[in-house]
Curated annotation (Swiss-Prot):
Binds to nucleoporins. Found in a complex with XPO7, EIF4A1, ARHGAP1, VPS26A, VPS29, VPS35 and SFN. Interacts with ARHGAP1 and SFN. Interacts with Ran and cargo proteins in a GTP-dependent manner. The gene is XPO7. This is Exportin-7. It comes from Homo sapiens (Human). Gene3D superfamilies: Leucine-rich Repeat Variant. InterPro entries: ARM-like, ARM-type_fold, Importin-beta_N, XPO4/7-like. Strong expression in testis, thyroid and bone marrow, low expression in lung, liver and small intestine, no expression in thymus, and remaining tissues studied have moderate expression. Expressed in red blood cells; overexpressed in red blood cells (cytoplasm) of patients with hereditary non-spherocytic hemolytic anemia of unknown etiology. GO terms for cellular component: cytoplasm; nuclear pore; nucleus.
């Protein structure tokens, strides 16, 4: 007993050190000791002692979090009886201790929610023992306010817990639990929550009473969690679902047809303090977003009418909207009015004219107060963008009145941005123009709004632009002009150039008229005249933000008015001809190139301008007709003949800048490569002339490497710049003739230099990444450009170099030792990922016969594959799926290996094979469809190989199985659980998930079934028996039909028949299970 007391005291002391000490070393030691405690065998009993006898809240918190970890573990899970005991203990503990610290109560409720979720399908005497949440909390709800808060919080946390997938359990299991919870409990919880809210709002709540205050807050959180539930498993990315539909089940219809539900929340909004209102509005946002198909047309019109009335009432009494959180949620609510309902439906609402006037006034006022809640403006602009986009399609006879109000919104946005410039400069405030992402998002929305009543938009822009441009010109000519006044006009012109680019980019070909094109011409003329003025001053001064706005304008102009699809008779070109003498597209392209060269000359050290300028050049070089016109321009010929640091400073070796600043060079040379290819043909002299600067750079690096002591920084910069340039050229050269010139130039002369760089600087990703990426590009047989002559050994020689580089990098990178978690991708995994991509490109390029390597005793292939295995085994399973680029490169390489090199896979050690199979098993449930599809393909190849070898081994053949195949079969027979697990997973996904790649899933399934017929039979029986008695026969028939006409082979005809059967099977199973709330009581199916 004394030992228990002593160890409790130690644990309490450690908790105090962990949560209270300011000394980092002490805290880390305490953390380490507590981790050991969590993993100790007597953790469970000590946690109970801590809860019973612990004197501090921190020790209670530790006990609750440790117990949560224990019940969550997937290996060695706690027995069912023990988990039931913990659940009951937690409920009793909460019921007898209402005055616990809030964080302790929260941790215990989290423990209850986790046990309930993970035990959702656990049965004891035919009773689902963890499905009694509402019964469990009834005793809390019938007690005092303090207990009622605990009960509501339990339901809220449970709903939230079941809605969230976690990485330690398969997604299929999560969705099955969520679906069952949705069907059996969620509506009851939502109804209970609404009833409690009605009771609370019916009483005169004393919100000075902190407990009643807390109860209302928890009820609103619970209601929001119910409405925010992922009903059909589609909201995997919460950052992008802001305009999504809430997929309310049909069984909830009654709650939404009853107008009192909607009215409850509008009444609450007006009757409770502003601090609660954001949650009320969040609930209204979700209610406004219920799927359209929940109602028929008449019901939807009635629901929309109530919704619009509620919005109108808020707009007529806007006092609470001065709170930023309320304002933000209300803007979201307004955006849902158009994302979920059609303009034709809105205009039929009785109060529409008054409501659209109020919304327009609210929007104009909001835009004028640009400094208040800027992130909320997105939702208002989204509403008006959707309204404006609907105008051409609206069929209703009722007036939409948008021709009156959209110009007001456009004017408010434009004038408010211009007026903000002076205040921002005067008060030193944060400039919205610094956040180019936010500005671009708003401009995309304005582009649609501004095209509605475009004449008014253009007239306003011309008037404001002329005023600012004239003032700017006068200030530049005045000797006494203050820098502040010049900065203000430059800021105003920056906004105007951005906005002009946006409205031109908003042009829609089928809805545009000659008059609107002529108006575009007026705007373009003004921007180009301003560009001439600012370019003429670049030698003295320049404005970075204005230059970025110009580039944004050029990009929009290019998309709309330059290219193969543009009608050359456009009135825009007529206006450009009259004002600026630009008669056709070629002359306009000349202006583009002139601007690009000017920017590269004067802004070569400004990364944002350089990268956007080069992106513009790159985009121009893609178009079939524009690239041919560009090549004829003298400025483009100048670039092709003078691409050196003397003319383009960003190509220089600036010792002050970072090595990663050279990324833009790849873009530059991709564009130059495309331009060069237009007229290159087979002209080797022209090619060699073009490559002279790169040849000189290679020779310089070779010279440095040949001496024992050289300037390492200079060598690195020269090499990194060079390989980035070459990757751009290699990417552009996608024809055989041009690519062969590049290959013969680089091999064998310069390949040793790349190998030497990897050998020297393997630990520095700033050097290795560009070199590895270049090699990956060189071995990529894009557009069949790597077609060597039949007498050429170059394909094999290229693969030897690939193997050499992978082996050298791989062996050296593994010597790095332990890498900190936050640096592991940059220092190690990124390079490994590129090596995987490189090997995949080489193996699938169809320019090497890999059979000859072993035949002639060449170990290049074997070295590359063995290095791949070494690198793979150095990566934890979790990292393979945590880093998307690594996932995609690994699984696509594995797909090639299982397809063409299965003998190599079969020859691996058992632990390696199990590692690879585990990675495939985990990848089957990945959220990335590409990864999941790749895993299906890998599994199909492995299963097919196994089936063929098994078939051969049972036949009397004169030639025995080779040693690798025999060993592989033996390993698979020793570990059948891995293949069986994958059979469970695939079948589970097909039956219970929103399976987006059903065809891919079907291909390995037949082989899995044929290899595991007894297991499949047991699995089938388990699924059938888990259904309600009246549905079991139908489910049994579904499985019978699945195997109807299927033979015991994997021939294409048989596979195709199975795939067809599977489509019908999935449909029939879904129909059969639609009204079923029963789950699958099978550990195999759920794991």
């Amino acid at each position: 007993m004394a030992d228990h007391v002593q160890s409790l005291a130690q644990l309490e002391n450690l908790c105090k050190q962990l949560y209270e000490t300011t000394d980092t070393t002490t805290r880390l030691q305490a953390e380490k000791a507590l981790v050991e405690f969590t993993n100790s065998p007597d953790c469970l009993s000590k946690c109970q002692l801590l809860l019973e006898r612990g004197s501090s809240s921190y020790s209670q918190l530790l006990a609750a979090t440790c117990l949560t970890k224990l019940v969550s573990r997937t290996n060695n899970p706690l027995p069912l009886e023990q988990r039931i005991d913990i659940r009951n203990y937690v409920l009793n503990y909460l019921a007898t201790r209402p005055k616990l610290a809030t964080f302790v109560t929260q941790a215990l409720i989290q423990l209850y929610a986790r046990i309930t979720k993970l035990g959702w399908f656990d049965c004891q005497k035919d009773d689902y023992v963890f499905r009694n949440a509402i019964t469990d909390v009834t005793r809390f709800l019938q007690d005092s306010v303090e207990y009622c808060i605990i009960g509501v919080t339990i339901l809220s946390q449970l709903t939230n817990e079941i809605n969230q997938a976690d990485t330690t359990h398969p997604l299929t299991k999560h969705r099955k639990i969520a679906s069952s919870f949705r069907d059996s409990s969620l509506f009851d919880i939502f109804t209970l929550s609404c009833n409690l809210l009605k009771q609370a709002s019916g009483k005169n709540l004393n919100l000075n009473d902190e407990s009643q205050h807390g109860l209302l807050m928890q009820l609103l959180k619970l209601t929001h969690n119910c409405l925010n539930f992922d009903f059909i498993g589609t909201s995997t990315d919460e950052s992008s679902d802001d305009l999504c539909t809430v997929q309310i089940p049909t069984s909830w219809r009654s709650a939404f047809l009853d107008s009192s539900t909607l009215q409850l929340f509008f009444d609450l909004y007006h009757s409770i303090p502003p601090s609660f209102s954001p949650l009320v509005l969040s609930c209204l946002v979700q209610i406004a977003s219920v799927r359209r198909s929940l109602f028929n047309n008449a019901e939807r019109a009635k629901f929309l009418s109530h919704l619009v009335d509620g919005v109108k009432r808020i707009l007529e009494n806007p006092q609470s909207l001065s709170d930023p959180n309320n304002y933000h949620e209300f803007c979201r609510l307004l955006a849902r009015l158009k994302s979920n309902y059609q303009l034709g439906e809105l205009v039929k609402v009785e109060n529409y004219p008054e409501v659209i006037r109020l919304i327009a006034n609210f929007t104009v006022t909001s835009l004028q107060h640009w400094e208040f809640a800027p992130n909320s403006v997105h939702y208002l602009l989204s509403l008006w963008q959707r309204l404006a986009a609907s105008v051409p399609y609206v069929k209703a006879t009722e007036p939409h009145m948008l021709e009156t109000y959209t110009p007001e919104v456009t004017k408010a946005y434009i004038t408010s941005r211009l007026e903000s410039v002076h205040i921002i400069l005067r008060d030193g405030l944060e400039d919205p123009l610094e956040d180019t992402g936010l500005v671009q998002q708003q401009l995309d929305q304005l582009s649609t709004i501004g095209r509605c009543e475009y004449e008014k938009t253009c007239a306003l822009l011309v008037q404001l632009f002329d005023q600012s441009a004239q003032s700017y010109q006068e200030l530049l000519q005045s000797a006494s002009a203050s820098p502040m006044d010049i900065a203000v006009q430059e800021g105003r012109l920056t906004w105007l150039v951005y906005i002009i680019g946006a409205v031109i980019g908003g042009r829609v070909s089928f809805a545009s008229t000659d008059e609107q094109d002529a108006m575009d011409g007026e705007l373009v003329c003004r921007v180009l005249q301003l560009m001439n003025l600012t370019d003429s001053r670049l030698a003295q001064a320049g404005n970075e933000k204005l230059e970025l706005a110009m580039l944004s304008f050029f990009e929009q102009f290019r998309k709309i008015y330059i290219g193969d699809q543009v009608q050359k008779s456009s009135k825009l070109y007529r206006r450009l001809s009259e004002v600026l003498g630009l008669n056709d597209e070629t002359m306009v392209l000349s202006v583009f190139i002139g601007k690009i060269i000017t920017n590269l000359k004067y802004w070569g050290r400004c990364e944002p301008i350089t990268s956007k300028t080069l992106q513009l050049l790159n985009d121009l070089s893609i178009g079939y007709s524009s690239v041919r016109k560009l090549v004829k321009l003298s400025a483009v010929q100048f670039m092709l003949n003078n691409h050196t640091s003397e003319h383009f400073s960003f190509l220089g070796i600036n010792n002050q800048s970072n090595l990663t600043d050279m990324r833009c060079r790849t873009t530059f040379y991709t564009a130059l490569g495309r331009l060069l290819m237009v007229d290159l043909g087979e002209d080797e002299d022209q090619y060699e002339q073009f490559m002279l600067p790169l040849t000189a750079a290679f020779e310089a690096v070779a010279q440095m490497f040949s001496t024992n002591s050289f300037n390492e920084q200079e060598a690195k910069r020269t090499l990194v710049g060079l390989v980035r340039d070459l990757r751009g050229i290699a990417f552009a050269f996608n024809a055989k003739t041009s690519f062969m010139m590049l290959f013969e130039w680089i091999y064998p002369s310069y390949m040793p230099i790349l190998q030497r760089a990897i050998e020297l600087w393997y630990h520095d990703p700033a050097c290795t990444t560009p070199v590895l990426k270049l090699m990956a590009e060189l071995v990529h047989n894009r557009s069949q450009r790597l077609q060597f002559d039949v007498s050429s050994p170059n394909g094999i020689l290229l693969f030897r170099e690939t193997s050499k580089m992978i082996t050298m990098y791989g062996n050296r990178i593994l010597t790095l030792g332990e890498v900190p978690k936050d640096q592991v991708y940059a220092l190690k995994l990124k390079g490994i990922s590129i090596c995987f991509s490189m090997l995949k490109a080489a193996l699938s390029g169809s320019y090497v016969n890999f059979g000859v390597f072993r035949l002639y005793g060449d170990d290049a292939l074997d070295n590359a594959l063995q290095t791949f295995i070494k690198l793979l085994l150095s990566i934890p399973h979790s990292d393979l799926l945590d880093y998307p680029k690594l996932s995609q490169s690994y699984y696509s390489l594995l797909e090639v290996l299982t397809q063409d090199h299965m003998n190599f896979i079969a020859s691996l050690e058992p632990h390696v094979i199990m590692y690879i199979l585990s990675s495939i098993s985990e990848g089957l449930t990945a959220l990335d469809t590409m990864v999941c599809t790749g895993c299906c393909s890998c599994l199909d190849h492995i299963v097919t190989y196994l089936f063929k070898q098994l078939s051969r081994s049972t036949k009397k053949r004169t030639t025995p199985l080779n040693q690798e195949s025999d060993r592989f079969l033996h390993i698979m027979q020793q570990h059948p659980e891995m293949i069986q697990q994958m059979l469970s997973t695939v079948l589970n996904i097909i039956i219970f998930e929103d399976c987006r790649n059903q065809w891919s899933m079907s291909r390995p399934l037949l082989g899995l079934i044929l290899l595991n017929e007894k297991y499949f039979s047991d699995l089938r029986n388990s699924i059938v028996n888990s259904q309600p008695p009246e549905k079991q026969q139908a489910m049994h028939l579904c499985f019978e039909n699945l195997m109807e006409g299927i033979e015991r082979n994997l021939l294409t005809k048989n596979r195709d028949r199975f795939t067809q059967n599977l489509s019908a099977f999935r449909r029939e199973v879904n129909d059969s299970m639609k009204n079923s709330t029963y789950g699958v009581n099978s550990n195999d199916m759920m794991s």
